[in-house]
């Protein structure tokens, strides 16, 4: 046999071993949809951006959402179930988008800029609240 060749029997064994290992492969991010629960444990590669709910650990009846685990990172310790996250626009962001389109139609030959800032604040009861701040400015273009 050459240096890069295996006997037929050993080659078949290696192929079947690789096929068996594929069964342990984690779900790929493209197969996971928002809301799916993903179980991860030590050594697993995070298949998608996930949000942590620690209420099962603390015994609280209401979900306690923590920071995100990012796709491609690895689990160093522990085991948990996490939910897939999705970046969605808030109703205010959707309205700002509609207002921008309307403003561009109405203003026609005028230059219009709309800046939107999203600010996250912590309320008195330790919950997050989003505040949207929109600032617009326009300039008329002389013909």
Swiss-Prot record:
It is a multi-pass membrane protein. It is an enzyme of class 7 (translocase). It catalyses: Ca(2+)(in) + ATP + H2O = Ca(2+)(out) + ADP + phosphate + H(+). Its EC number is 7.2.2.10. It comes from the Eukaryota. Signal peptide: none annotated. InterPro entries: ATPase_P-typ_transduc_dom_A_sf (IPR008250). Keywords: Allergen, Calcium, Calcium transport, Endoplasmic reticulum, Ion transport, Membrane, Metal-binding, Sarcoplasmic reticulum, Translocase, Transmembrane, Transport. Gene3D superfamilies: Calcium-transporting ATPase, cytoplasmic transduction domain A. GO terms for cellular component: sarcoplasmic reticulum membrane. GO terms for molecular function: metal ion binding; P-type calcium transporter activity. It is found in: Endoplasmic reticulum membrane; Sarcoplasmic reticulum membrane. Belongs to the cation transport ATPase (P-type) (TC 3.A.3) family. Type IIA subfamily. This magnesium-dependent enzyme catalyzes the hydrolysis of ATP coupled with the transport of calcium. Transports calcium ions from the cytosol into the sarcoplasmic/endoplasmic reticulum lumen. Contributes to calcium sequestration involved in muscular excitation/contraction. PANTHER family: CALCIUM-TRANSPORTING ATPASE. This is Sarcoplasmic/endoplasmic reticulum calcium ATPase. It comes from Chionoecetes opilio. The lineage of its organism: Eukaryota, Metazoa, Ecdysozoa, Arthropoda, Crustacea.
């Amino acid at each position: 046999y050459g240096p890069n060749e295996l006997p037929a029997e050993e080659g078949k064994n290696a192929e079947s071993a690789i096929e068996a290992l594929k069964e342990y492969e984690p779900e790929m991010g493209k197969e996971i949809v928002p809301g799916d629960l993903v179980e991860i444990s030590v050594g697993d590669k995070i298949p998608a951006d996930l949000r942590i709910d620690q209420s099962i650990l603390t015994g609280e009846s209401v979900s306690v959402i923590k920071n995100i685990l990012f796709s491609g990172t690895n689990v160093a310790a522990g085991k948990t179930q996490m939910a897939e996250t999705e970046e969605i626009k808030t109703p205010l962001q959707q309205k700002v988008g509609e207002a921008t389109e309307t403003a561009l139609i109405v203003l026609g030959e005028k230059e219009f800029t709309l800046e939107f800032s999203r600010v996250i604040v912590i309320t008195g009861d330790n919950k997050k609240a989003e505040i949207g701040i929109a600032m617009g400015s326009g300039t008329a273009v002389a013909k």
